[in-house]
Amino acid sequence: MRHALLEGQRDIVLLLARVLLMILFVLAGWGKLTGFEGTVGYMTSLGAPVPTLAAAVAVIMEFVVGILLILGFYTRPLALLFALFVLGTALIGHPFWSMVDPERSANMTQFLKNLSIIGGLLALAVSGPGRFSLDKG
């Protein structure tokens, strides 16, 4: 009785979770891809040692891997890889500890948002993609 609300809904909930977790990244990755020069400029502003490579990695992770996770393709390993990517973007892109307000507050929120997303990705890595996926098992 205590789980009746989601009884028999595991697979559809996992599909919804994959879409909701990744839609932000797929859209951001598309923006980075279609505005690649601007993405390289942003990576340069962050101090990335090889900004063009960093921009390409961001596009591949956000757009390509994001779509693969929505489709449920190699879900468990890609969810773990994506969690590491999100941790890296949190540490590099939102170093709130070295800022002052109001920039500090805004970046702390983004940093914590990234940690929350990592939690969802870890849950996905443990649970797997569900039946509505390209993975076989």
Show where each model-derived region lies:
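Extended, low-polarity transmembrane helix blocks
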Residues: 1-34, 44, 52-60, 64-137
